[in-house]
């Protein structure tokens, strides 16, 4: 989990704004330009914009069925994105009416992206101004400058983490059903207009990006939250693996649904509920107990609800591709950080069998009606694409995995980018010496970006 920070106000710091402050810096944190946040925002905007445009086209054509599902997947994905961003930034605990207003309008990712870019340029400006300051004496101006730098760093890393989780949830709870639906519509009416193709392209990019994020998260967990840096060859291998896996699985599902129509629904529900119930069956078999106070029923209900939501997302990921992690509800960490070849091989074996069965159903029941020709060739290409994806997966874990090839950056963690500590020492006057300085780095993580200590003058 990430460390979440709160800004310091006068009440929490005991009126420290009117006191003499001294800031002692540790190692300087380095921030990079938020390209990942911009990319996630572009995917969000593109998918929502083209989805709304297709909704308008279906509405004018009186296609109520397709119109309803298209707008439903857009709204569900967009609302979940707003909830994730507000959850990580703890907006509901603060008086942030303006940000809440933008989230209600489903424009939260755009506003936060622009805010992060502004903070990054503000951080660069403050660093440049800090270097120009004389080091003869530390004034209150220097104190406020260092605090602005600290807040910029805190906000940048918090937004990066929030957008990472937003990308995963948007991909597998919004983009996957949207991509399957639009492909099903194209197969049914045998038309591929440019607008629908662009919507499918953004959805495919979103799912692939979310799958890559799952891989990076799994590698960080297996290496104790250590930051990784994949060279171009390793990154290309992961991209090809995830792209081929996602495209072959999604096209297979679309062909299967188009072949059997509503008769395919029970099969798809069985596949989904197997992934959903498997962690709970393993938890029940282990005989473990849920964490928390058994006497507090509300706490127990909240824990069960949170675990159920996690398993819903876990099953949605495994429905379209491999989640790269294994849920272990009996453990306090929930996610098993060990690399299990057995779990990996079992997943790909069963999913390959599912794909072959669905492709055979398409070949013998829907190939002639959905496609005028080349149904056998397409079926073979789908199987070969999935086998190629499995081959890239084996290549990555056997020869290019960062833990084995020494590409883990020592001394750096996801929660601790480059500097181990960032100390803020505050000397307060005798008027405020009985008021305690609140640590604005919450302990929701093992290691914080900041460590605050207080020095008080003795009368």
From Swiss-Prot:
One GO location term (cellular component): plasma membrane
Pfam families: XK-related
Key word Transmembrane present: yes
UniProt entry keywords in alphabetical sequence: Cell membrane, Membrane, Transmembrane, Transmembrane helix
Organism domain of life: Eukaryota
Expression sites by tissue: Expressed predominantly, if not exclusively, in testis.
Entry's localization field: Cell membrane
Signal peptide (residue range): none
Residues passing through the membrane, by range: 35-55, 68-88, 97-117, 169-189, 199-219, 238-258, 264-284, 300-320, 345-365, 377-397
Chief location: membrane
Keyword Transmembrane helix: yes
Topology in membrane: Multi-pass membrane protein
Family: Belongs to the XK family.
Protein name stated in the entry: XK-related protein 3
Species of the source: Homo sapiens (Human)
The gene coding this protein: XKR3
């Amino acid at each position: 989990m990430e460390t979440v920070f709160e800004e310091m106000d006068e009440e929490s710091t005991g009126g420290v704004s009117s006191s003499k402050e001294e800031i002692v810096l540790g190692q300087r944190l380095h921030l990079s330009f938020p390209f990942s946040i911009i990319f996630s925002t572009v995917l969000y905007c593109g998918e929502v914009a083209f989805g709304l445009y297709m909704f308008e086209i279906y509405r004018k054509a009186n296609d109520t069925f397709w119109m309803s599902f298209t707008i439903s997947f857009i709204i569900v994905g967009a609302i979940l994105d707003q909830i994730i961003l507000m959850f990580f930034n703890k907006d509901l605990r603060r008086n942030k009416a303006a940000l809440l207003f933008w989230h209600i309008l489903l424009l939260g990712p755009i506003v936060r992206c622009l805010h992060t870019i502004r903070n990054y340029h503000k951080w660069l400006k403050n660093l440049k101004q800090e270097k120009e300051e004389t080091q003869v004496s530390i004034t209150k101006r220097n104190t406020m400058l260092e605090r602005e730098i600290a807040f910029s760093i805190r906000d940048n890393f918090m937004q990066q983490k929030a957008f990472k989780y937003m990308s995963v949830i948007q991909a597998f709870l919004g983009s996957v059903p949207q991509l399957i639906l639009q492909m099903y519509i194209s197969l049914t009416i045998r038309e591929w207009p440019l607008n629908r193709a662009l919507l499918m392209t953004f959805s495919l990019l979103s799912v692939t990006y979310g799958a890559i994020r799952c891989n990076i998260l799994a590698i960080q967990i297996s290496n104790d939250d250590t930051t990784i840096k994949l060279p171009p060859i390793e990154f290309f291998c992961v991209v090809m693996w995830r792209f081929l896996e996602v495209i072959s699985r999604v096209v297979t599902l679309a062909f299967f649904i188009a072949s059997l129509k509503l008769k395919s629904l029970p099969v798809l529900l069985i596949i989904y509920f197997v992934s959903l119930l498997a962690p709970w069956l393993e938890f029940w078999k282990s005989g473990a107990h849920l964490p928390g106070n058994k006497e507090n029923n509300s706490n127990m209900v909240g824990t069960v609800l949170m675990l159920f939501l996690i398993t819903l997302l876990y099953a949605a990921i495994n429905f379209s591709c491999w989640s790269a992690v294994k849920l272990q509800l009996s453990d306090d960490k929930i996610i098993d950080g060990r690399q299990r070849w057995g779990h990996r091989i079992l997943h790909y074996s069963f999913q390959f069998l599912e794909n072959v069965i669905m492709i055979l159903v398409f070949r013998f029941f829907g190939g002639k009606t959905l496609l005028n020709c080349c149904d056998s060739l397409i079926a073979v290409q789908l199987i070969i694409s999935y086998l190629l994806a499995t081959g890239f997966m084996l290549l990555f874990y056997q020869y290019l995995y960062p833990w084995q090839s020494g590409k883990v950056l020592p001394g750096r963690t996801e929660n601790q980018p480059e500097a181990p500590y960032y100390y803020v020492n505050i000397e307060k006057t005798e008027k405020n010496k009985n008021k305690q300085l609140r640590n604005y780095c919450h302990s929701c993580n093992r290691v914080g970006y900041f460590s605050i200590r207080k020095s008080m003058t003795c009368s």
